[in-house]
């Protein structure tokens, strides 16, 4: 029987994992990558080509290595918990080499058009038109996986800033920022307080004369480093914390999170406190911003009302003169011009079942992979989406009816609108654990905690109270990995490894406290398990 051929569009993180997902299910992937190398967003270039995602030289990832790794390929234990972009790219190269993925990628190949074949209603096949070195080619594929991400088109709303066309200084989108030396001794306005805006404000403040960080709403600032020095995402991303948040509800959960954030620094005193609650916006992850604010190197300002030739006038009436540069850290938009009408994007919104499948196709042979902005790591979600998609392509899993999918999409969009502030940043928002657990159930790889509580209680405790790492979804079912159990039980060893660069005397009181805590957690765990039995 001839293998099904799958077109994978994009050779970034989602594309690499999708190639591997195809191979695991005996499919034949052909990946098209418009640039000359893998890595997508995480491959730094001084002058990236148009339409390609871009990062600045100093970027450090906001999710820790245990939460962002591929599910059957842990990141080396000596790597730092929060990796520089060069380490991230190096890990992707190791992954591609380990599983032999590069031979399936056609580099310097642009996908121009993807359209249904005339017999699509019965075959589900697609015609894919590509261009390589000036030559056009048409291929037929049994399914298509779109892995182009959502950081390609810079969102630059200049129409919202009257007078910017008269401004005599330099202005550009954060996509084009590379290093701080160009701003030495200058007065710089940064518009937007997302992750890029916060990072740029901190970095440029080390060379600039003054940085003004302009924010329309304000933001809650989340530390990478949490209690006792462990990564914050490791501490927050457990089934227990997710279970607890559902019991407490949004109001109490918000109150707790805001209290924790304000214990680090008072957001109101620093001029950062927004009107919305902490869990109503994607958080800004930044360890250094409050230090630069309290040192006076970064001044927080409100929204810019207008620009003059040399000044920025803010909505509160204040004015800053002699501005040399304005950087718009205003995010990105996405589209799929090569898909024609198969997937429509309206105001940065797209209708996809579980953020993967278009509901209006006669055959479920098109999947959008990685089009999500999670409260957590995106890499493991992309991988799990790919594992689900290839099962659907093979007919091993089926999707609900079109009406059922549309009803679920409408419900999901209403929930996003209810929870989050209205922003194009939140149109593809998703919760890490909820998304992973839901798709894992579709794939057949969601851990059975009730069964494990009796057969392997040590592991069950780790699965419930420990960080919900991607490796959890290799314990059972399709794609089971024999090393999963050991990798889960040694999670904290890998977290501590890069920090153990000097011997210190261990505290007995700490060991005792940990032992007591583990015992109490075990009691709580079995009480919950028995309640659900």
From Swiss-Prot:
The lineage of its organism: Eukaryota, Metazoa, Chordata, Craniata, Vertebrata. The modification Phosphoserine is found at residues 54, 58, 280, 401. Expressed in liver. Acts as a Baeyer-Villiger monooxygenase on a broad range of substrates. Catalyzes the insertion of an oxygen atom into a carbon-carbon bond adjacent to a carbonyl, which converts ketones to esters. Active on diverse carbonyl compounds, whereas soft nucleophiles are mostly non- or poorly reactive. In contrast with other forms of FMO it is non- or poorly active on 'classical' substrates such as drugs, pesticides, and dietary components containing soft nucleophilic heteroatoms. Able to oxidize drug molecules bearing a carbonyl group on an aliphatic chain, such as nabumetone and pentoxifylline. It comes from Cavia porcellus (Guinea pig). The modification Phosphothreonine is found at residue 284. Its main location: membrane. One of its GO terms (cellular component) is endoplasmic reticulum membrane. This is Flavin-containing monooxygenase 5. PANTHER family: DIMETHYLANILINE MONOOXYGENASE. It comes from the Eukaryota. The chain crosses the membrane at residues 510-530. One of its GO terms (molecular function) is monooxygenase activity. SUPFAM superfamilies: FAD/NAD(P)-binding domain.
